[in-house]
Amino acid sequence: MADLPHPLAAFIVTEIRRARGASGMTQDAFGRGAGFSASHVSAVESETRALTLDFIKGADRAFKNGGLFERMVGKLGAPSWFLPWLDAERTATQLRCFQPSLVPGLLQTESYGRAVIRCNDTLSDDEVERRLAHRMDRQETLTKATAPHFVAVIAEAVLRRARADFRDIMAGQIKQLTTLAERPNINIHLLPDEVSMHVGLTGPFSLARLPDHKWVAEMENQLGGVVIDRDDDVDTLMSRWEMVRSEALPRQQSLDLMKEVVTSWT
């Protein structure tokens, strides 16, 4: 977390460090209880080593607190399974994202993101705003000094499908996409409507290339999601990425189409 600590991860690290100090545990004693070396604990606490879900679970074991820190991650807007992906996203040198049904979270406007999150009508207003704030914080990934090269493939239908009362939100969202698409580190490609059959129909996925050149992936479903690091599975998703990317429009044609589509919402 040396270059730009993720707000959520940095907060959790601070709370773990504070709890350790309040309990009187040394880093060595805490590490024995958590299953990590004292040097590992020191590196996480000084934010020179990434916070992981395993470390959070280890902290809960060391403090015997019934899973407090893992629950805290969820309460602050990110499910615990998502934390490894947040770290991958933050440290990645390259990001790839395919979305057949929504604008990717890293590209969403606040209004669009709020509307999407509100589709889950079981969430309270406070929970909606917590999740939205977390999503907006993540977008710093694409604008920081060491921003990764980000390539998104979005189905054209995503930009054309909305309720009548969604017009202003959608217009604002597409305008933001056209602005972001002008950034040198961001490529946005539209998968045109006429490509009706493709390998991406089975669902969205993302890929991240880490500083050690290893690729990891993330997939979501109705019950949550999973971060994938098994080489064979990542290779399969990389192959599918290449297939959907090859079906999408080139960068400039995609930008021109976005500018055309936005006029239908204004």
Model region roles, listed by residue range:
Residues 2, 70-102:
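Short, charged recognition helix plus adjacent turn
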Residues 1, 60, 69, 85-88, ...:
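Bulky hydrophobic/aromatic packing residues
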Residues 94, 100-266:
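Hydrophobic protein-protein interaction segments
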Residues 1-76:
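Basic, Lys/Arg-rich alpha-helical nucleic-acid-recognition elements, primarily the DNA-binding modules
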Residues 41, 80-82, 201-202:
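Short secondary-structure transition/capping segments
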Residues 19, 72, 76-79, 244, ...:
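Short, leucine/isoleucine-rich alpha-helical interaction segments at C-terminal helix-coil junctions
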Residues 45, 89, 220:
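Acidic-residue sensor for enzyme active/binding pockets
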